[in-house]
């Protein structure tokens, strides 16, 4: 719009705004002039084209400069009336103004209050009526059309953008609903990306209402069906069905908690699957712990458009362990120990109540080993650790036996005899070393017999796998026992995926703790060995929602 020229000093020239207001009031005096006025401001009358040079953006400032002339008690400016028209969801109807074509105004209001009429247009016309304008008389044969259309920037905006897809609108509704109830939108995941294995927990809601199921977007249904209807994913992904926690209540929803694992070397396939299933349309952030949360952060962002909320793995380990133990294992205790571990014939698994767990020595046996002294839920310290862990066992077995998987290595170890590989106390002393209480069957030197060519030629791959397993397990047990004595803690809890389907190591650890402490130390184990970090990450997802 071209700027108005300011009046010269001393001039009697009437300001343009005043002339415009006088002209508009004069034209409003008759119904016929009202129609001409509508044409002047560039509004179609009965479907005619707008006149060039009188477009809406030019006329709107005039309307805002005019003073209210209607009979309403509200003396607000046209700006305020326009704002009401834009913002109010239930615009009030202006009362008829005497001498301003009430009949025409009734037609106008009737049209705008009819079903399907835009609310913003009705409010805008009401604003005009309040400021001394009336529309032209409408023909009774033709349906009346709105006389004034707001600029796009003043139009009332719908709750969701008009161009959004139904799936996106549904996702936004789910997020708003979740926000009101202080819980995150589905799906609910927690990840622990370790050096050897990725552990994933997924909460499957079982209390979905008919309305939720109807509004559920297709890719969310696809993810749930894919994860819960399969027990294997590709060549290496496994869902541990026997560990599933059923009828669990988490964050106010009832459902089942699933436990899934796959090798870390297959992480790129998982990220690609997340991209193909458009996971970022459901979530923008995943809660993840473990070293891989840092290593793969950029890949998640670039390939799957996902952000990783990185969490401390030891914090998640403790929080997840305490939570799973508190809910139990489908009506059974999560924790157990081995009774009579020094007697193979009488040794058997027994449940253990861990209601009062503090203090405890927590030995996390993954690719490597970390040992924590835990004094309360939020008070713990890392005492020590060792690089000789589950990764060492599998790596050496692959070198020595040619096996390729953890399961294959354990299967071979179960069939082997480590005494053919290790040098024992009796091989040196001819029997027990009684002065220090060393039995002749105790290992004096791991792999000590492999110095002999004859021994090397007589052993089997299974013997090598068993000796490797015994070596790693004895080393961990020895360090754990010393830490327990130094910290004056009599309960040692062993967790981690090194113990998965590894009954040989568990019984060896139970035997070592009991024998070398003369029954003072008890080795404890948990059913969900290596998944506690992932559970802790899932719990953090709920905490994030509470904080927000």
UniProtKB/Swiss-Prot annotation:
Motif, Nucleolar localization signal: chain positions? 1-8, 168-185
For bias kind Basic and acidic residues, which ranges apply?
62-83
Q: Kindly state which keywords UniProt assigns to this record, in alphabetical order.
A: ATP-binding, Coenzyme A biosynthesis, Cytoplasm, Cytoplasmic vesicle, Endosome, Kinase, Nucleotide-binding, Nucleus, Phosphoprotein, Transferase
Q: Which residues bind acetyl-CoA?
A: 367, 370, 382
* Effect of deleting the gene: Pank1 single knockout mice exhibit reduced hepatic CoA levels, a reduced rate of CoA-dependent fatty acid oxidation in the fasting state, impaired gluconeogenesis, and mild hypoglycemia in the fasting state. Show a reduction in pantothenate kinase (PANK) activity of about 50% and 40% in the liver and brain respectively. Pank1 and Pank2 double knockout mice develop progressively severe hypoglycemia and hyperketonemia by postnatal day 10 leading to their death by day 17. A reduction in PANK activity of about 90-95% seen in the liver and brain and hepatocytes show reduced levels of NADH.
One GO term (biological process)? coenzyme A biosynthetic process
Q: Does the keyword tRNA-binding apply?
A: no
Amino-acid biosynthesis as UniProt keyword: no
Q: Which family does it belong to?
A: Belongs to the type II pantothenate kinase family.
Function, as annotated: Catalyzes the phosphorylation of pantothenate to generate 4'-phosphopantothenate in the first and rate-determining step of coenzyme A (CoA) synthesis. Required for the hepatic CoA increase during the switch from glucose to fatty acid oxidation that occurs in the fasting state.
Query: What is this protein identified as?
Result: Pantothenate kinase 1
Q: What is the native source organism of this protein?
A: Mus musculus (Mouse)
State which gene encodes it: Pank1
């Amino acid at each position: 719009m071209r700027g108005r020229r300011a009046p010269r000093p001393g001039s009697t020239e009437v300001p343009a705004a005043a002339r415009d207001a006088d002209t508009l009031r004069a034209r409003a005096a008759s119904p016929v002039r009202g129609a001409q006025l509508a044409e002047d401001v560039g509004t179609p009358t009965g479907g005619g084209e707008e006149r060039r040079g009188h477009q809406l953006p030019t006329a709107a400032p005039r309307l805002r400069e005019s003073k209210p002339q209607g009979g309403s008690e509200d003396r607000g400016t046209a700006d305020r009336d326009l704002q009401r028209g834009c913002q109010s969801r239930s615009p009030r109807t202006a009362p008829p103004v005497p001498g301003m074509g009430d009949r025409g105004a009734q037609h106008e209001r009737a049209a705008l209050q009819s079903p399907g009429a835009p609310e913003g247009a009705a409010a805008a016309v009401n604003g005009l009526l309040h400021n001394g304008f009336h529309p032209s008389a409408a023909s009774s044969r033709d349906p009346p059309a709105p006389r004034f259309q707001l600029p796009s920037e003043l139009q009332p905006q719908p709750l969701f953008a008009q161009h959004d897809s139904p799936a996106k609108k549904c996702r936004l509704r789910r997020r708003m609903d979740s926000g009101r109830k202080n819980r995150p939108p589905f799906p609910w995941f927690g990840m622990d990306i370790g050096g050897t294995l990725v552990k994933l927990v997924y909460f499957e809601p079982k209390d979905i209402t008919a309305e939720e199921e109807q509004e559920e977007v297709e890719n969310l249904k696809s993810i749930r069906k894919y994860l819960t209807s399969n027990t294997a994913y590709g060549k290496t992904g496994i869902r541990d069905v026997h560990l599933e926690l059923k009828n669990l209540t988490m964050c106010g929803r009832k459902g089942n908690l699933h436990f899934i694992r796959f090798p870390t070397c297959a992480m790129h396939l998982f990220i690609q699957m997340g991209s193909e299933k458009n996971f970022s349309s459901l979530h923008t952030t995943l809660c993840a712990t473990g070293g891989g949360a840092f290593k793969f952060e950029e890949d998640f962002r670039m390939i799957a458009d996902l952000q990783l909320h990185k969490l401390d793995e030891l914090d998640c380990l403790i929080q997840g362990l305490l939570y799973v133990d508190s809910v139990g294992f489908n009506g059974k205790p999560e924790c157990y120990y081995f009774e009579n571990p020094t007697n193979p014939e009488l040794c058997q698994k027994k449940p253990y109540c861990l209601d009062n767990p503090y203090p405890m020595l927590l030995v996390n046996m993954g690719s490597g080993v970390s040992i924590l002294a835990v004094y309360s839920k939020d008070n713990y310290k890392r005492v020590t650790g060792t690089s000789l862990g589950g990764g060492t066992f599998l790596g050496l077995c692959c070198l020595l036996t040619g096996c390729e998987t953890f399961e294959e290595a354990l299967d071979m170890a179960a069939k082997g005899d480590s005494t053919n590989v290790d040098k024992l106390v009796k091989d040196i002393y001819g029997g027990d070393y009684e002065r220090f209480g060393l039995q002749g069957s105790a290992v004096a030197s791991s792999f000590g017999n492999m110095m002999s060519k004859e021994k090397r030629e007589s052993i089997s791959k299974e013997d090598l796998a068993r000796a490797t397993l015994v070596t790693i397990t004895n080393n961990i047990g020895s360090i754990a026992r010393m830490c327990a004595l130094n910290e004056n803690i009599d309960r040692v809890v062993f967790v981690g995926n090194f113990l998965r389907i590894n009954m040989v190591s568990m019984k060896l650890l139970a035997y070592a703790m009991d024998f070398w402490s003369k029954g003072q130390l008890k080795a404890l184990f948990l059913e969900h060995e290596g998944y506690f970090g992932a559970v802790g990450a899932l719990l953090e997802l709920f905490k994030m929602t509470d904080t927000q």
